[in-house]
């Protein structure tokens, strides 16, 4: 579910509106609320949002819900988010931060690309990223040099080359172009996790 914090005009009434609107009663409520807000002002802007994707409000802020097609796009977005797992919601938050977003169309397009991204677990800093890369073999180092590695520099170089953004579970990055050792490690980790369930 996505709950929007809306404002009528610049200084008008503030309203909460939740999506997706799936039942006829919910759809009628959304339509009535929007008609009421639009009757006194041409704009109904999103001031914030509450959802499982923690940073979604940042990307929806300022969107004029009274504009053509915006209510439908928000409803479609909320529907897609409702079907995402908690892990996918965290991944999607990182995907939003890692991409250039300029409206609801971009956000909707990005929901279709979840499988193009991975989370590098526990990588919340350049230092932890470097340790992960060395540990999984993506950055091979002779055993006798392990104590001399500048993990932060390794992590920074990786981030510069691959982009991405942090999320609550690690670092979100596109799969395309990742070292095979990283992909293999993620695959092995996923299998181990599934066996433990």
Question: What function would you assign to each model-found segment?
Answer:
Residues 150, 190-197:
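Non-Sec secretion/translocation targeting segments of pathogen effectors
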Residues 156-190:
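Long, highly charged low-complexity segments enriched in Glu/Asp and Lys/Arg with interspersed Ser/Thr
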Residues 1-44:
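N-terminal ordered "arm"
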């Amino acid at each position: 579910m996505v709950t929007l914090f809306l404002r009528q005009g610049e200084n008008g009434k503030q309203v909460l509106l939740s999506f997706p609107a799936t039942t006829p009663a919910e759809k009628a409520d959304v339509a009535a609320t929007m008609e009421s807000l639009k009757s006194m002002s041409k704009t109904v802007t999103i001031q914030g949002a509450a959802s499982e994707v923690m940073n979604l409000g940042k990307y929806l802020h300022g969107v004029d819900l009274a504009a053509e097609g915006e209510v439908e796009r928000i409803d479609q977005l909320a529907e897609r988010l409702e079907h995402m797992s908690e892990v996918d919601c965290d991944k999607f938050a990182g995907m939003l931060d890692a991409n250039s977003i300029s409206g609801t169309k971009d956000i909707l397009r990005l929901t279709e690309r979840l499988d193009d991204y991975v989370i590098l677990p526990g990588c919340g800093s350049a230092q932890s990223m470097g340790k992960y890369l060395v540990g999984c073999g993506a950055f091979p180092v002779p055993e006798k040099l392990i104590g001399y590695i500048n993990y932060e520099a390794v992590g920074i170089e990786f981030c510069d080359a691959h982009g991405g953004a942090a999320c609550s579970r690690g670092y979100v990055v596109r799969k395309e172009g990742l070292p095979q050792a990283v992909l293999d490690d993620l695959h092995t980790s996923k299998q181990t996790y599934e066996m433990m369930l």
